[in-house]
Regions:
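Asp-based, Mg2+/Mn2+-dependent phosphohydrolase catalytic module
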Residues: 2, 99, 103, 119-242
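A broad detector of the eukaryotic-type serine/threonine protein kinase catalytic domain
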Residues: 61, 84, 88, 110, ...
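A short helix->loop->beta-strand "cap" motif at the edges of active sites that frequently abuts
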Residues: 109-110, 189
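Charged linear interaction tracts used for macromolecular binding and regulation
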Residues: 114-117
Length: 242
């Protein structure tokens, strides 16, 4: 089986956006009049569940009263504005290991797509600063503001694969957020998680980014593959352990 498409997230995958996300969350807390302040560990813990773009939701109770929803939405909007201002003022550079994977994959004939739940304007700012006019030549599809909450087969991964004519079994998604990884798995893609890991009381990020060569070895391993499913069934989630 081939790797025809690799989907990359932006947060924690192509860019280290942790510092601006942390600053944006704390600024939004302050604007909302909340006393809570996060450190990097708290942000990573929330991001592991909600993704970095919506990590601030980790500060909210699971069943938010209706009267508080507008305040919560305003806080999320404030966070997005603070984040956008931060990445425009001090643009983060693309991570070297991710760039190496992109270059190796493209050299092997693989398409690279971007799917992120960051607002489209923020995604555009990050990519434009890092790649300039090469964005359209490097990335086959760029989707910002993606929603990962839809029914399986209807989300951003399924739409992108349909547009470029690739089967889910020939595509891999690499992300640091559970919502994106879950949506990719439900769409039948292989997935690689580089999400922050829980080690006792500590939440830490992976030390290494997977290489394209390692990705191919994992994908081609007979231990990674399951028996074929009938065409009428949705492919079972398949996760490659980096």
């Amino acid at each position: 089986m081939s790797i025809d498409v690799i989907f990359l997230g932006l947060d924690g995958v192509l860019f280290d956006t942790e510092p601006p996300h942390l600053a944006a969350c704390n600024a939004a807390f302050a604007t909302a009049g909340l006393s809570v302040r996060w450190d990097a560990r708290a942000l990573r813990k929330a991001a592991a569940t909600h993704g970095y773009a919506r990590a601030i939701n980790g500060a909210l109770p699971p069943n938010l009263p209706a009267r508080d929803k507008k305040r919560a939405n305003d806080m999320a909007d404030d966070k997005h504005r603070e984040f956008h201002h931060a990445i425009v003022t001090a643009p983060p550079k693309a991570l070297p290991a991710a760039l190496a994977l992109i270059n190796d994959a493209i050299a092997d004939g693989c398409k690279i797509c971007i799917v992120t739940d960051l607002p489209a304007a923020a995604a555009s700012a990050l990519l434009s600063n890092a790649f300039g006019t090469d964005v359209n030549s490097l990335f086959t599809v760029v989707t910002g503001g993606a929603s990962f909450d839809g029914a399986p087969g209807t989300g951003p991964y399924a739409r992108a694969l349909h547009a470029i004519g690739v089967q889910p079994s020939d595509a891999i998604a690499i992300d640091a957020g559970t919502p994106a990884l879950r949506a990719a798995e439900e769409a039948g893609l292989w997935t690689v998680s580089i999400a922050p890991a829980q080690h006792g009381a500590e939440v830490v990020r992976p030390r290494q980014f997977i290489t394209y060569e390692a990705l191919r070895e994992l994908h081609d391993s007979p231990f990674s593959h399951q028996a074929p499913h009938q065409a009428s069934q949705i492919a079972s989630p398949r996760q490659l352990a980096a």
